[in-house]
Amino acid sequence: MWCLLRGLGRPGALARGALGQQQSLGARALASAGSESRDEYSYVVVGAGSAGCVLAGRLTEDPAERVLLLEAGPKDVLAGSKRLSWKIHMPAALVANLCDDRYNWCYHTEVQRGLDGRVLYWPRGRVWGGSSSLNAMVYVRGHAEDYERWQRQGARGWDYAHCLPYFRKAQGHELGASRYRGADGPLRVSRGKTNHPLHCAFLEATQQAGYPLTEDMNGFQQEGFGWMDMTIHEGKRWSAACAYLHPALSRTNLKAEAETLVSRVLFEGTRAVGVEYVKNGQSHRAYASKEVILSGGAINSPQLLMLSGIGNADDLKKLGIPVVCHLPGVGQNLQDHLEIYIQQACTRPITLHSAQKPLRKVCIGLEWLWKFTGEGATAHLETGGFIRSQPGVPHPDIQFHFLPSQVIDHGRVPTQQEAYQVHVGPMRGTSVGWLKLRSANPQDHPVIQPNYLSTETDIEDFRLCVKLTREIFAQEALAPFRGKELQPGSHIQSDKEIDAFVRAKADSAYHPSCTCKMGQPSDPTAVVDPQTRVLGVENLRVVDASIMPSMVSGNLNAPTIMIAEKAADIIKGQPALWDKDVPVYKPRTLATQR
């Protein structure tokens, strides 16, 4: 029926036509495989990232289900030790992996016309835990209205009432349970607690500028500024692998592989039956009696669908890939958060500049290795906030992260002086991009085209980001620390100058999403239905950030884990959790911006 909706005739006709070659190849391959012992599981999960780790943990709670988890990258521990894998597990060492291709796909975009022709670097996790093993450990759920919007966009059953219980189920917050927080979940969450004087001064400055202080931006009131929640536990990064995968490894019904690249999904007609993968240079096959589940993320999941014959038929044929199902939404609807750094010199030697000098780094590292304490035990992005950019905006559309340091080129260039900065950017940009296969070779990175700043609305929103940040930085609370403005610089004042600065300096916040959009079967851009099943085929799901219909207002790790928790219940046939009429803050008036 789905292929008929796509205008390609009956599924049977498609199988005899465009699928003929695929079926004959598949039949020969399956016949050949039949002569060998079949490596069969209930579920094959591709990708041990934020979502895949959740699925591995939850699906193997039933001892009758056998699960194979395949990850292209290495394990996140060396010889079972987090200390030996300090680059991953020491929170302050997060920049160490941003350019390390042992743990990172190291993607790059195409040339961005809206960013002065620049090519942007996109680090993505390629390790157990995925990007939750590389990210800044900020735990942000987004706004309740994001999930109401998903419902309106066709993701029925994914409104806030049906998502909040899964946020709670996943979360083990150090502050205990509430209507909004979970206390007993596997994902350990703590509140920023260094009380660095610059963090305190920043929060005071935001209040002097007229913004509220929120005690829990993941609870009743996202709007305002406050201390951030972090996926840090006892001084160590708490990734999805720490939360879900490692506790499940002792189960006999879970097999978790590392350094294993899946090259395609295997089909019998339009039914997914397994995957083909490469390990140690050898090709292997694994079969799923129930389902194959893709959890590779917003780049790898659509890439694997297309390599397997699911995507835009014309594009696949050009690369010689047999078409299983014409699904033109695959790889489309690419969305990402873009951000800019506003940097200010600090007149006092209290920033993290000295902590990045060689001898001091050694001391910090030794303390962390010994006790998991000290400056190595935090990511330092401990305060931030969410505000509305202008009157009439119903809920926050700008996000701030404050850092008592200076970041240059993704941290690849050492800091040059005592300075502090804000990472700021719009959360619901209107520029939408796409990704496509570069070739039929699974090892080739896809073509990534985010189309950053391709709308006038987006550049106007960034203009507001710069102006509103400058207003906060000018408040009295920061006067004792305020030196000259380093970026954009006091000479940048007019709208035209600000726009030029943004186009020259804006960079990705590392939040790609929405490339396998969830929606109704009648939506020609949808890839999966609200049960996470790939449209037009059987026994195949996608569960990760790629299925978001649209971006959430914040970081993506917490929502991705929520998606996987909810999907696990769907897959197991459990009744959906829901919590009706949970109060959510609304401004008293929209006539003012704050």
From Swiss-Prot:
The modification N6-acetyllysine is found at K484, K496, K580. FAD binds at residues 42-71. It catalyses: choline + A = betaine aldehyde + AH2. GO terms for biological process: choline catabolic process; glycine betaine biosynthetic process from choline. Its main location: mitochondrion. Keywords: Acetylation, FAD, Flavoprotein, Membrane, Mitochondrion, Mitochondrion inner membrane, Oxidoreductase, Transit peptide. The gene is CHDH. One of its GO terms (cellular component) is mitochondrial inner membrane. It comes from Homo sapiens. It is found in: Mitochondrion inner membrane. Its EC number is 1.1.99.1. Residues 1-29 form a transit peptide. Pathway: Amine and polyamine biosynthesis; betaine biosynthesis via choline pathway; betaine aldehyde from choline (cytochrome c reductase route): step 1/1. This is Choline dehydrogenase, mitochondrial. The active site is at H511. Belongs to the GMC oxidoreductase family. InterPro entries: FAD/NAD-bd_sf, GMC_OxRdtase, GMC_OxRdtase_N, GMC_OxRtase_C. It is an enzyme of class 1 (oxidoreductase). The modification N6-succinyllysine is found at K436, K484, K496.
